[in-house]
């Protein structure tokens, strides 16, 4: 639908990247989708290019691990045994990765760019507060088809808004 769009996929899991590479090939996106193994923004790719204007994205979309550590044992077996713990464990309160990503996202978003998260159904207010605390505006929680909070969206301030 967006034939000029370019993307960079980042995951810490080698297995997840293998699946992403298969999907990229199947969809014919090899020239438009770059895939990087990294723990968030720690890869050399981001460190070497952190001042590079070409690394300013229009949007960052993340589905980070968001289940509190103590709740992982309570998950349905289909989830608990299908997904690796690495993909589920959001640490103590389930918000660890939202904090880490949000505090760094501004360095990689263009002014007016969007940060979007998938969230646990009870995390909308907390993730919204994290984003607002880092200066994101127009923060909105979107519901899924079941009527549960599922996505939080926020906008990086425009340059002139940041200096007011």
Set out the residue ranges of the language-model regions:
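Conserved SAM/SAH cofactor-binding pocket of Class I
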Residues: 1-74
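Residue-level signal for inorganic ion chemistry
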Residues: 20, 63, 79, 101, ...
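Helix-to-beta-strand junctions that scaffold the AdoMet/dcAdoMet cofactor pocket
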Residues: 29, 83, 108-111
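C-terminal beta-strand of the catalytic ATP-binding
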Residues: 66, 155-158
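Mobile active-site "lid"/loop adjacent to the S-adenosyl-L-methionine
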Residues: 66-96
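Conserved Class I SAM-dependent methyltransferase catalytic core
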Residues: 92-156
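Flexible, glycine-/basic-rich loop-and-beta segments that form/coincide
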Residues: 158-164
